[in-house]
Amino acid sequence: MTESPSPSAEAAAASRAPVGLFEAFLFWLKLGFISFGGPAGQIAIMHQELVERRRWISEKRFLHALNYCMVLPGPEAQQLATYIGWLMHRTWGGVIAGGLFVLPSLFVLIGLSWLYVAFGEVPVVAGLFYGIKPAVTAIVVHAAHRIGSRALKNGWLWAIAAASFVAIFALNLPFPLIVLAAAVIGYIGGRLLPGKFALGGGHGAAKTSYGPALIDDDTPTPEHARFRWPHLLRLCVIGAALWLLPMGLLAAAFGWQGTLTQMGWFFTKAALLTFGGAYAVLPYVYQGAVGHYGWLSPTQMIDGLALGETTPGPLIMVVAFVGFVGGYVHPMFGADHPFLAGAVAASLVTWFTFLPSFLFILAGGPLVESTHNELKFTAPLTGITAAVVGVILNLALFFGYHVLWPQGFSGAFDWPSALIAVAAAVALFRFKRGVIQVLFACALAGLAVHLLRG
């Protein structure tokens, strides 16, 4: 039952001074270092800090902002931080909030990626990753189940998921084509069968009041958050310049076929396809980074996902690992500077991956608000989310194949890896253990197996 705040509480909120930009900066910096647990955990942390504890924003406005971010491609937790920062402190507030959500993870991943590339063959490190690989397979299966249980609400959506699995597994169709087809089916389904394609997985109305907030239910929309065509045009021009300038410099310095140039182009496309979160776009990253460009091996891709799971920030930051390894093994600054090449590649990949996400919030936030909950906009997302389930299942099979048959089907079946994968699945599904706990336990199990084998 919702409790109404007392008049004294309302008066206290009204007299409270606004949060300064520096105070907000310190909070967003802290959040960047503690944002473990994937999007659900990160959103829970923000809710606890911003809604319940600090009262910077009300429950209703928080969920309203989260629903906007759910409609956009990109990591919803990072976009939510950007949105709230923008709502509180204009454009710079959004840039600071979203940037600090990502930067700690980038620095940590650059360091871990270097340790992985430089010392990955050391027995202890190799043993830890031997146990982590089957755990990642179980984690991806769990992600498919989690998203599917929320998204596949009827037979039509199940059919889309099955078709997307066949399309990528049997027909090897490109991931962007699958997303486009699912969006078209969702749009048509929304017109013909609106009840079957209503947006699912969103967040409902607020049911709890934690007292008055600085940005409360009835607080008017700030002037800077109101939609204006000139403002939208200006931000689109700035965004285009922020993309074209580094791409132009890369093309001029390394040529269009250069590693860094191709990374910038590839991850720009990947950023526009992240409906459903990082697990949804990983098959596309695999198709390009592993299959087409050869920036890293299938085994390295699995290890990179494990590193992404154990660091703060969005899981899509696994792209920084892909960039680092690709730059490290294709050193464009000479054979004596592989770390510099890897660090630059990881930073550029992060820039091109997250630039669209910032623009969607800063330029499109007011526009998205004006179209929120209209079926013609949300039905395509429903179709895409259903397709994502089939794509993630394919990713799980891909990981499982490389983990359980490391030498291919003609080689031996890896029974210890299979047992570790089953144990990880039981821990996730039956005992509801966290991802980091599962990875840690499986890493120790893998180390034990590796040492026993000698």
Residue ranges and their predicted role:
Residues 1-72, 83-311, 315-454:
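Multi-pass membrane proteins that catalyze or facilitate reactions on polyprenyl-/lipid-phosphate substrates
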